Amino acid sequence: MAREKFERTKPHVNIGTIGHVDHGKTTLTAAITATLATAGGAVAKDYSDIDGAPEERARGITINTAHVEYETADRHYAHVDCPGHADYVKNMITGAAQMDGAILVVSAADGPMPQTREHILLAKQVGVPHIVVFLNKQDQVDDDELLELVELEVRELLSTYDFPGDDIPICPGSALQAIEALSSNPDVKRGDNPWVDKIFALMDAVDAYIPTPERDVEKTFLMAIEDVFSITGRGTVATGRIERGVVKVGDNVEIVGVGDTQTTTITGIEMFQKTLEEGFAGDNVGILLRGVTRENIERGMVLSKPGTITPHTNFESEVYVLTKEEGGRHTPFFTGYRPQFYVRTTDVTGSIEQFTADDGTIVEMVMPGDRIKMTAELIYPVAIEEGMRFAIREGGRTIGAGVVSKIVK
């Protein structure tokens, strides 16, 4: 049978399930696919299909992630679910699966637990902009007052981490009950079964509350420079992959990073040896720049729309330190450690100024396998922005992954 063509008729949104171990993230993922399959919007997946997630590599780190896709009446979703807690931490920090929003799964029988808190904090730090809550295992709670208490507790916790706790939709239900109802009768329609209806209600909330993200092409232009060469008689060409936005011949752009920011005009764009009038996010292009000498531009700089990105040296970040099994260090490192920070396309040396634990205490030492808040200073300014991912390297091997949470200077 010929492969089906991917029809882009509905807006696309990336989401994922987050929350404490055993609160039902994977069961909920299975329940969503089974529920939407009744309306033709998904292929039902079993728990075991999702839980046996294949390994992937992102920024040199191995992560287990399951990807499922489904559709509601309004949207197409790509949904990511991770089997293990460490996989979540790595996934969120490396941005291997970017989330436009998340479904926080909390067991109504247990209430918020340590990883509930940690995943909310991580979502805040790495820039997951919106959260919808599913209070799972409602069938195990006989007392409505208890359910209200858990809901209140979740709202307070979300507010603690600067999410709008009072406004976030919280949907109660039972993923397992919904799956059982659907496996005994796959033709259940909306309105036939209260547990299945609760999954539909959750997806209504996700449709309504998580906004359709701005597509990469709608954002301001940015391209990290991977290589530079001169074409005799024509000028200097910078090559790279356009990270976001659209760029046209005749546009003015800034060259940012390492030294003073320069402004220039684009006189030509090429892709696969063909000339283009414009390049879009995702394209690998060569951009011909007017009046720029080969000496004034190098790998690691970025081309951007004027005034949209500035070079910085000091930043706060959320970092995951690789274990030795993952190819990281065997020993801890301390404040003052000077690794390389691999930012977009280049290594920049920097020193680690401070480590801070989740509770705000200063930590002197970090062990392989830890997740920590880290303040760093680079030896020269490069184009950095909040939400940007980077790797920490030592002698060419990756020893950590991070995401910028705040620019200091």
UniProtKB/Swiss-Prot annotation:
EC numbers for this chain: 3.6.5.3
Keywords carried by this UniProt record: Chloroplast, Elongation factor, GTP-binding, Hydrolase, Magnesium, Metal-binding, Nucleotide-binding, Plastid, Protein biosynthesis
Localization (cell): Plastid, Chloroplast
GN (gene name): tufA
Residues holding Mg(2+): 26
Annotated GO CC locations: chloroplast
An example Gene Ontology biological process: translational elongation
Reaction(s) catalysed (UniProt annotation): GTP + H2O = GDP + phosphate + H(+)
Summary of the function given for this chain in its UniProt record: GTP hydrolase that promotes the GTP-dependent binding of aminoacyl-tRNA to the A-site of ribosomes during protein biosynthesis.
Residue ranges, annotated region (G2): 60-64
Main location: plastid
Protein name per its UniProtKB record: Elongation factor Tu, chloroplastic
SUPFAM superfamilies tied to this protein: EF-Tu/eEF-1alpha/eIF2-gamma C-terminal domain, P-loop containing nucleoside triphosphate hydrolases, Translation proteins
Annotated stretches, region: G4: 136-139
Protein family per UniProt: Belongs to the TRAFAC class translation factor GTPase superfamily. Classic translation factor GTPase family. EF-Tu/EF-1A subfamily.
Coiled coil: none
Region spans: G5: 174-176
PROSITE patterns listed in its UniProt record: G_TR_1, G_TR_2
InterPro entries, alphabetized: EF-Tu_GTP-bd, EF-Tu_GTPase, EFTu-like_2, EFTU_2, G_TR_CS, P-loop_NTPase, Small_GTP-bd, T_Tr_GTP-bd_dom
UniProt domain tr-type G: residue ranges: 10-214
GO molecular function, one term: GTP binding
Binding sites annotated in the UniProt record for GTP: 19-26, 81-85, 136-139
